[in-house]
Amino acid sequence: MSGCGLFLRTTAAARACRGLVVSTANRRLLRTSPPVRAFAKELFLGKIKKKEVFPFPEVSQDELNEINQFLGPVEKFFTEEVDSRKIDQEGKIPDETLEKLKSLGLFGLQVPEEYGGLGFSNTMYSRLGEIISMDGSITVTLAAHQAIGLKGIILAGTEEQKAKYLPKLASGEHIAAFCLTEPASGSDAASIRSRATLSEDKKHYILNGSKVWITNGGLANIFTVFAKTEVVDSDGSVKDKITAFIVERDFGGVTNGKPEDKLGIRGSNTCEVHFENTKIPVENILGEVGDGFKVAMNILNSGRFSMGSVVAGLLKRLIEMTAEYACTRKQFNKRLSEFGLIQEKFALMAQKAYVMESMTYLTAGMLDQPGFPDCSIEAAMVKVFSSEAAWQCVSEALQILGGLGYTRDYPYERILRDTRILLIFEGTNEILRMYIALTGLQHAGRILTTRIHELKQAKVSTVMDTVGRRLRDSLGRTVDLGLTGNHGVVHPSLADSANKFEENTYCFGRTVETLLLRFGKTIMEEQLVLKRVANILINLYGMTAVLSRASRSIRIGLRNHDHEVLLANTFCVEAYLQNLFSLSQLDKYAPENLDEQIKKVSQQILEKRAYICAHPLDRTC
């Protein structure tokens, strides 16, 4: 393998991989055990933990049979009985539809069986998400109920809390909502103003505050609510910290506003929820007092990955619908399917669906392992990739359909409206990119602390080691991270893509060290840098997923595995080239880096709060 030697054949890539001396200045239960391993974090060190991701996860035949038997009635219901157009127009899911969803068990998919749920694994939950995605409003309603609404009880609840609340939540008799966002705090969850004050008898907390954009807010009986509480620190000082509570509507003082009139997912119930002197028993604290922020992040981190299967299911149906149109519609005496620009759109949709599907089921498989790894970064990457791919691919589908895609007589414009929220839901993609990059950099920083300190102090042995690395890179260093060869885990038909993945990973690790040396702790403020770091990592994880999945498909002889190889290789080449450019941009002095210009343009606009260029028809005299 040519390693960074190939990488260094272009000027931009050479800059990206410069030396580091830049300056001296058995039951299917939802597993809730503590995380013990991580895959994505090791990529920041230029390492690939093969055992975490190769071979691609598999489910047992019994589990596969079970989920397939369950899918049939659900798919039949969505196909024959769900009127998505009516739901969208009326802005409400009919009561009879909700009752049918409850009877199918869809409100308790991941609730453990001993509490009345189905106890689906993450993999089975993802598979069902492909079917539920047939209606965006229903998808959001169910996800808000169990992916975030009741998830805190599963993850952090006591046995008493689980026994009290989960059975009715699993059956759908009670519906759950997640109450975090407030009028003055969106992505900045730590700045919430709702307050819970301990009563004099210390038996209740009195909750006051308002929450906004609460899905299921007008339907819910049970709310997971986050509020400021006074906490006595170890030094005796009193501080405000966030605490999570399980709040019943029946506690009193709980009201909600009218449903919001939204762009998309119009049938889901989204409204403000108000708490006025709501008495919460101390037994309803979720987790520990003052640990609410951690509880909130664990809830959100645990559910994001499933967006990938939802979007993949949507895109696969969209491909079928638009392919039928493209193969029958004629223009200029040729079918649309014969035009290269139309073919490009189908290739894009298929590739995006394949990558997000692979990322989702790889992540779900890791989470389903005993002592599951820390997959918070992986889940965030799936969410970012799939939400952006959804918006891009649905837009391309409308382009294929022309005017048909723009009219309300067909479902396409509704699908476009429904998908826009995905880039905002469960953490905006901007915030998640910061999370992805900073979490990984923090991991790398802890491990590289000594080396970076020695480089800053110009320790001779460390500097010479760095110079030696730089020299070997410039001469064409061989990068072999064990993916190919006699003992490799990637099929030979994917070897070139595996080599590209190894090269990118190695050079990413080198670049991370450079960034930590250059910025230190101030890297937290460098959002344009962090965005590129996150984008590289998302590509690397996508490459990982498709290489693992396609290798498995070849090995076991799945139908159309040659098509998978084609999709995997195409994505890996594109991701590799994107990564080269991003790596070059991370060099402060590279011509590809326009950070200062971007900041200057933005500053000038925001100072005037307007577009400041003169009109092209203006004159000076």
UniProtKB/Swiss-Prot annotation:
Tagged with keyword ATP-binding: no
InterPro entries reported for this sequence: ACAD9/ACADV-like_C, Acyl-CoA_DH_CS, Acyl-CoA_Oxase/DH_mid-dom, Acyl-CoA_Oxase/DH_mid-dom_sf, AcylCo_DH-like_C, AcylCo_DH/oxidase_C, AcylCoA_DH/ox_N, AcylCoA_DH/ox_N_sf
Residues with PTM N6-succinyllysine: K92, K521
Subcellular location field: Mitochondrion inner membrane
CDD domains tied to this protein: VLCAD
UniProt effect for mutating A326T: In MC1DN20; likely benign
GO molecular function term, any single one: acyl-CoA dehydrogenase activity
Gene3D superfamilies found in the cross-reference section: Acyl-CoA dehydrogenase/oxidase, N-terminal domain, Butyryl-CoA Dehydrogenase, subunit A, domain 2, Butyryl-CoA Dehydrogenase, subunit A, domain 3
Family: Belongs to the acyl-CoA dehydrogenase family.
Protein name (database record): Complex I assembly factor ACAD9, mitochondrial
Organism ancestry: Eukaryota, Metazoa, Chordata, Craniata, Vertebrata
Gene name tied to this protein: ACAD9
